[in-house]
Amino acid sequence: MKITDAAFYISAAALSGLPDLQIPEIVFAGRSNVGKSTLLNSLAGIKGLAKTSSTPGKTRLINFFLVNKAFFFVDLPGYGFAAVGHEQHEAWKKLLTTYIERRSAITLVVLLVDSRHPAMQSDREMIDYLTYLGKPYGIVLTKDDKLTQSQRIKARRVMESSALNAEFIVNYSSFSSKARLELLAHLAQYIR
């Protein structure tokens, strides 16, 4: 798949704010600061498409990006960020679970996992949740460039044993065009 056009479309703080377009949605989920926005910028080839920050919890809305005028990339707020109040945390959790459970346009959930910490409890819980829902999901091991080759292999093996139902597992660095092309090839299968 080649991305020729990508632009921010809308942010939603509630289900009522979701776009009405009935086009495929590929959802990017993961812990806070795992690199979701960086990955979206890398995939689209547009620096600054999705706002990035070194501060965890910066993405606080469901952000939709229209790609090739044919489908959405959806950037979810990260989970596991504790610096928000309990009420805010519960509101996000309800919004995200309702969105993932009820949104029929979702064709794939891409779960980003920090390759330096591939066995986090919150990531395993998300894998179990997606498996329970029967949602197709793939795993992207981010920040791959920060590992040695043996650490990459170990991280991948951990994910292969944890995510038995994953459609794919990709080791990803935003500096690698090979990883980008591999991931785009997987995503192309979910754009109907």
Swiss-Prot record:
Keyword Hydrolase in the entry? The reply is no
Read off the CDD domains from this record. YihA_EngB
Classification via InterPro entries: G_ENGB_dom, GTP-bd, GTP-bd_ribosome_bio_YsxC, P-loop_NTPase
| GO MF, one example | metal ion binding
The cofactors named for this UniProt entry are:
Mg(2+)
What Gene3D superfamilies would the database entry show?
A: P-loop containing nucleotide triphosphate hydrolases
Annotated Pfam families: MMR_HSR1 (PF01926)
Specify which residues bind Mg(2+) according to the UniProt entry for this protein: S37, T59
Asked if the keyword Zinc belongs to this entry, the reply reads no
A GO cellular component entry from the record: cytosol
Among PROSITE patterns, the record links this protein to: G_ENGB
The entry marks the following residues as binding GTP, namely 30-37, 57-61, 75-78, 142-145, 172-174
Domain EngB-type G span(s) in chain numbering = 22-192
Which UniProt keywords are present, listed alphabetically?
A: Cell cycle, Cell division, GTP-binding, Magnesium, Metal-binding, Nucleotide-binding, Septation
The Gene Ontology biological process terms listed for this entry are: division septum assembly
Q: Which domain of life is it from?
A: Bacteria
Similarity comment text for this entry: Belongs to the TRAFAC class TrmE-Era-EngA-EngB-Septin-like GTPase superfamily. EngB GTPase family.
Function field: Necessary for normal cell division and for the maintenance of normal septation.
Name recorded for this polypeptide? Probable GTP-binding protein EngB
Q: Whose protein is this, by species?
A: Chlorobium phaeobacteroides (strain DSM 266 / SMG 266 / 2430)
- What are the leading ranks of the lineage? Bacteria, Pseudomonadati, Chlorobiota, Chlorobiia, Chlorobiales
